[in-house]
Amino acid sequence: MLQYHMIADGRVQGVGFRYFVQMEADRHKVAGWVKNRDDGRVEILAEGPEESLKQFAEAVRKGSPFSNVTGVTIEESHRLKGYRTFSISY
């Protein structure tokens, strides 16, 4: 099990990107949260098996139909918070 702390850049706010991230998290069976940042980027904390996180991260990089993801930074960690679900934080 790993944790990814991700920051997505580009047109990722006001386009349903957080909902898309939540759907992808459910599809890849990862837990954590997603939230908008004041700087226009989106922050994601995701935990799960390594292969699931890799597939999830690839989906985030591709983005939703209405988003335009220009970059995603990922910090990997073994310090898990123990999330059981994935939620949108406001």
From Swiss-Prot:
InterPro entries found in the cross-reference section: Acylphosphatase (IPR020456), Acylphosphatase-like_dom (IPR001792), Acylphosphatase-like_dom_sf (IPR036046), Acylphosphatase_CS (IPR017968)
Domain Acylphosphatase-like positions: 3-90
Active site: R18, N36
Class in the EC hierarchy, top level: hydrolase
Pfam families from the UniProt entry: Acylphosphatase
EC number: 3.6.1.7
GO MF entries: acylphosphatase activity
Segments traversing the membrane: none
Reactions catalysed according to its record: an acyl phosphate + H2O = a carboxylate + phosphate + H(+)
Keywords assigned: Hydrolase
Similarity annotation: Belongs to the acylphosphatase family.
Protein's name in the database: Acylphosphatase
Species name: Bacillus velezensis (strain DSM 23117 / BGSC 10A6 / LMG 26770 / FZB42) (Bacillus amyloliquefaciens subsp. plantarum)
Gene: acyP
